[in-house]
Amino acid sequence: QPRPDHSLRVPRPDLTVKIGTPNACNGCHAHKTAQWAADQVAQWYGPQRRQESHYGETFAKARAGQAQAAEALAKLVADAQQPAIVRATALAAMRTDGSTAMSTRIDATRDAEPEVRAAAADSYESAPAAQRLYALAPLLRDPVRAVRIAAARSLSSLQPGQIDAATRPAFDAALAEYVAVQNISLDMPGAHLNLAVVYENT
């Protein structure tokens, strides 16, 4: 089965043992356990092969609701050495309350990677109006359309009077872009739902 991020991964049966992720070894050796595969890899390549920390462990902590997950996710979002899709996913996995989440989100709106900026815009969807507008108004003029429309979508539930006159033209333009993108995909139910939400909000 193809991965959503299109990557080809080095098998890590040790991670299967730790957090239950699939691995290519047991795809063929289905009658064997993940521990057997991890032991074989250690026997062939040495016990230290690919034992470094993996971002999958951070996501596993978050999904299990572990207390230390917030700090681990924040570090992952801030790690520019990680792929943008991983950092954006970490941002989406963070709870939206708490000082760690707040500082991580505002930093992410200024990130060099558009995928991370778009995820930051999405993360503000339920934030208080003033906080949301302060963080997302600059993204309405982002050079990347995906970021602009993510910001417009998150701001669309604000009351008309909550968007100041200086921001209104950029908001209207970005929201029009979002509607145009949905109109391209009207053969898909999701586009109709997205438009319905925006029209209800505005």
PLM feature spans:
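Primarily the internal scaffold of c-type cytochrome electron-transfer domains
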Residues: 1-84, 92, 143
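Composition- and surface-driven signal marking solvent-exposed, interaction-prone regions
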Residues: 2-8, 38-46, 89-90, 105-107, ...
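Feature representing long, continuous alpha-helical segments
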Residues: 6, 23-26, 71, 88, ...
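Short, solvent-exposed linear motifs at loop/edge-of-secondary-structure regions
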Residues: 22-33, 136-160
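Structural detector for internal amphipathic alpha-helices that build alpha-solenoid repeat scaffolds
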Residues: 54-65, 85-99, 107, 115-129, ...
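Amphipathic alpha-helical scaffolding segments comprising HEAT/armadillo-like alpha-solenoid repeats
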Residues: 67-78, 98-110, 128-140, 161-179
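Short coil turns that connect the paired helices of HEAT/ARM alpha-solenoid repeats
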Residues: 78-83, 109-115, 140-146, 184-186
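C-terminal luminal/periplasmic domains and tails of membrane-associated envelope-modifying transferases
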Residues: 83, 144, 150, 165-202
